[in-house]
Every structure is written in C-alpha cells, then in structure tokens.
Amino acid sequence: WFIALGASAQAEAVRILAFGDSLTAGYGLAQGEGFVPALERELRARGHDVTVIDGGVSGDTTAGGLARLDWSLGERVDAAIVELGANDALRGLPPEEARANLDAILEKLADRGIPVLLAGMRSPPNLGPEYRAAFEPIYPDLAEKHDALLYPFFLDGVAADASLNQPDGIHPTAEGVQ
C-alpha cells in the first residue's frame, strides 16, 4: 500500500491522514510520543518521504469522524488510515450506526481516490457476545466492500499487556505505541 504510493514518483512528500480518535491523537502522551509522530519517524527511517497528518480527536465516535471528514481532507491527502469505532463500542452505541458511519467515511475517501488502511477495533467484553457478533465484523466487511487494506485490531499486541497501557487500561503508553 505505502510502497505503491511511493512508487508514483511524486515530487512532494506523500501525505497520509491518520484519521481517528484518542488512540490516533496520542491521548495522555507527551508531544512526539503518539501514534502519528511515531509512524512518521518509522516511515522516514525506512527511507520514505512522508508526512503523517494528525487527524485524531480524543473521544471521537464514527459519527463525529464522519461529520469532520470533509474538513480534515482540506489539505492534499494521498492516503488515509481510518481508526475509529472504539468510542462507539465503549459507549455501547448501536453497531449498525458505527457500520453506517464508517461505510460513509470509506465511500467519501473512495470518491476522492484516496486509498485507505482501515484499523479495526474490538468491542469490550462487558457488552456481551451479541454486541461483539454485530460489532467486530464491521471492519473486515467494510474493508472488503471498499477494497481497503485491513489491520484487524489497531491495539494488537498492546491491549492485553498492562505494561504497554496507561493506568486507564485503554490508551497505550509511549512504549505501547511503538
């Protein structure tokens, strides 16, 4: 995905919009320790001329993301990472609403020809198996529908490790971001 963007011989740095919630915004972390600066550093270290735009808003839901997407795309964007839905699940919002909002976000990005990496989320266990069965298929279903790349669980390898999470047990530490 990223390699293909770099191969297009652009004169300017590839601009990736990291569009999400507090996990994207780096909630509770010092400046420079969050996901966006860590991703940009890693990609640059691998030789990619890239700028990662911080489109993270703490507390945001898929509805909030949909409402602010056009504004967030005001600058030139060559690709997008969409990481939304955790707050929908934490609030127990209906999974069908999260699905509809993410579907609309991916549709708008596709209409602009912006390739997407969709970062999946998991529902909290306390919401039960019915909620989980409705929520968790959203990401693979929509990635397939919109021909987006899928990272199945944004917090993979981090969520279950208390040492990689802040005291709230939800947000990664600087080490967890890595």
Residues covered by each model-derived region:
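Serine-esterase "nucleophile elbow" of acetyl-processing enzymes
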Residues: 10-58, 66-76
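Alpha-helical cap/lid subdomain in secreted, periplasmic
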Residues: 38, 45-48, 64-178
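Bacterial N-terminal signal peptides
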Residues: 1-6
